[in-house]
């Protein structure tokens, strides 16, 4: 947009990590040439505290992930930073931006990744890998049989900014 039309813009994704959310707000207000509202600093501090409080609760917990409305690799980078261990990630694509988050995930663990979010064949992996949680789409019947707790983030399409961090932490904790 900037190069072609001279229009500045910010890619404001549904990030989970407080630092990335705060950076997006800073870029937005810089482009608008407006001061960053003070309440954003407070929300940022709240999100950092909420994330830190989640670490002892989530540390070591394993999960599978189906596709979500969130920025998938960023979400998993955030969750691994909290100490969670993804066993299998179902992700539809890998963009250039995702590469940094993929590398962050690999500093914590090396999960299986499948491009197809095909619940049919993947249902057989619940009793084998035994994840504590399934975040996003999945086979509810097989999860129940395997003792995997289903976590749905139904509000993901309706939130942005620090609300994403709040939703993620509340849904999983």
List each model region and its residues.
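An N-terminal assembly and electron-transfer interface module characteristic of large anaerobic redox
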Residues: 1-173
């Amino acid at each position: 947009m900037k190069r072609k039309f001279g229009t500045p813009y910010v890619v404001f994704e549904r990030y989970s990590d407080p630092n990335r959310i705060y950076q997006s707000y800073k870029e937005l207000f810089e482009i608008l040439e407006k001061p960053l509202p003070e309440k954003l600093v407070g929300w940022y501090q709240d999100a950092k505290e909420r994330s830190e409080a989640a670490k002892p609760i989530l540390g070591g917990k394993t999960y599978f992930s189906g596709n979500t409305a969130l920025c998938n690799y960023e979400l998993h980078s955030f969750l691994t930073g909290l100490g969670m261990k993804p066993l299998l990630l179902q992700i539809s694509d890998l963009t250039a931006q995702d590469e940094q988050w993929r590398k962050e995930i690999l500093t914590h663990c090396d999960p299986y990744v499948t491009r197809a979010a095909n619940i049919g064949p993947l249902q057989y992996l619940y009793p084998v890998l035994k994840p504590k949680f399934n975040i996003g789409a999945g086979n509810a019947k097989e999860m129940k049989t395997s003792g995997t707790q289903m976590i749905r983030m139904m509000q993901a399409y309706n939130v942005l900014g620090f609300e994403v961090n709040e939703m993620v932490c509340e849904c999983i904790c």
